[in-house]
Amino acid sequence: MATNIRIAAVSYLNSIPFIYGIRHEGNLAAELLLAPPAMCAQNFIEGKADVALVPSAVVPTLRGAELITDYCIGAVGKVRTVVLMSNTPVERVRRVWLDFHSATSVQLVGYLAKNRWKIEPEWLRLDDYTLLERAEEGDAFLLIGDKVFDHEGRFAYNYDLAEEWMVQTHLPFVFAVWVARKGLSYEVHDAVERALTFGVEHIYEALLDTPHASREYAYEYLTQNIDFLFDVEKHRALKKFWDFGLKVSPKVNPG
């Protein structure tokens, strides 16, 4: 049995199958640290976690880390929970307010702004979500995670970033991947792999363990929008994102 393992996982609906699997895998005794994606990466960097689900954009900067498992948080087409929302068509957007809970999504919107939408907006940090209720002409908001569900239908224009990436590159997208500290035993790697497999194979049961069970969209989202398999095409997509997407970083105006 793999014991005393500290695992940082994302506290969003998209990670519920992973969390369920980790909690129910008999050969894995782990301490779970749940947080938004950016904090999962920080927990790994600070040595608080041995294994972590981290934004794909940060992996090249992690020291002493290696990619593990055949699983990820990915999408083939629309992901639904990483969306640029606006009452202005994207070609006329002047300001983009960024949700910094995931470095990957921030990098991705920067890549799409330059290469797909051909715009050069002012980039601003979104800390006050009441700004969404006071949107001005030319404003757009990058929203990430479960909060997107609360704002669906509020804006006239919604640009799903995974869908926009696929139109641009003809590839799926990888938002988050599993990493581990180099040197962890085979038993740990195997136990984590088995745990994630169990969770992905029991999505319905995983939802019953959570408040999301009563939400009609939850099962559809996890089975139709999120693609958990880190397959060959997603490896290709991740390499392309690392080669090109990371070169375009939105320069945020501090205000």
Residue positions per predicted region:
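A conserved helix-loop-strand patch within extracytoplasmic ligand-binding domains
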Residues: 71-130, 165-166
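Pocket-lining segment of extracytoplasmic ligand-binding domains
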Residues: 125-208
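Ligand-binding clefts/hinges and TM-proximal coupling segments of bilobed small-molecule sensing domains
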Residues: 103-127, 179-225, 229
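Beta->alpha turn/N-cap motifs
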Residues: 12-14, 36-38, 48-60, 71, ...
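Short helix-initiation/N-cap motifs at beta->coil->alpha
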Residues: 31-42, 120-137
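An extracytoplasmic/periplasmic, membrane-proximal ligand-sensing/linker region
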Residues: 148, 208-255
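A bilobed periplasmic-binding-protein/Venus flytrap-type ligand-binding module shared by bacterial periplasmic
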Residues: 21, 81-90, 95, 173-187
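Short, well-ordered beta-strand elements
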Residues: 2-11, 30-33, 94-97
